[in-house]
């Protein structure tokens, strides 16, 4: 009986301590020029993308993405695209991450994102068919 209790406690502790990065995370901050920026990073199974935009206007600033893996608290990303530094494409970067239920932190550069989505399927999940568009106020359907 003691073995089963010990096994249960061990498994429970492991499941509590290993939070998933899967989902969406958001961070708001000031650029070096004093402009308010928002970055959103989305992690799915094995792929991530981060986009940065101006908080006030929504204007696009920067994006990168690629594959990722997590070994303990070390995340490794292989860059597949980078709008600001195309020479990074194909490179790998590794860094320490701290993940809990609500935050994703990179302690090396003091950055912290807040969870905005847990990655579970929502009402809009699935394939979409774009059957038309609006141009100059006129609706065109396929």
Sequence positions of predicted segments:
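Sec-dependent N-terminal signal peptides
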Residues: 4-14
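Lipid interaction determinants
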Residues: 16-63, 76-142
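Short, conserved beta-turn/loop elements at beta-strand boundaries and strand-helix junctions
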Residues: 71-75
């Amino acid at each position: 009986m003691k073995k089963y209790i010990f096994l249960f406690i061990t498994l429970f502790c492991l499941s509590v301590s290993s939070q998933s990065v899967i989902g969406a995370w958001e961070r708001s901050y000031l650029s070096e020029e004093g402009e308010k920026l928002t970055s959103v990073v989305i992690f799915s199974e094995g792929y991530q993308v981060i986009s940065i935009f101006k908080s006030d206007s929504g204007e696009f600033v920067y994006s990168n993405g690629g594959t990722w893996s997590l070994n303990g608290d070390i995340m490794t990303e292989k860059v597949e695209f980078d709008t600001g530094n195309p020479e990074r494409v194909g490179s790998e970067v590794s860094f320490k991450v701290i993940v809990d239920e609500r935050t994703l932190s990179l302690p090396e550069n003091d950055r912290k994102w807040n969870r905005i989505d847990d990655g579970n399927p929502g009402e809009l999940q699935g394939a979409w068919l774009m059957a038309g568009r609006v141009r100059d106020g006129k609706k065109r359907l396929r």
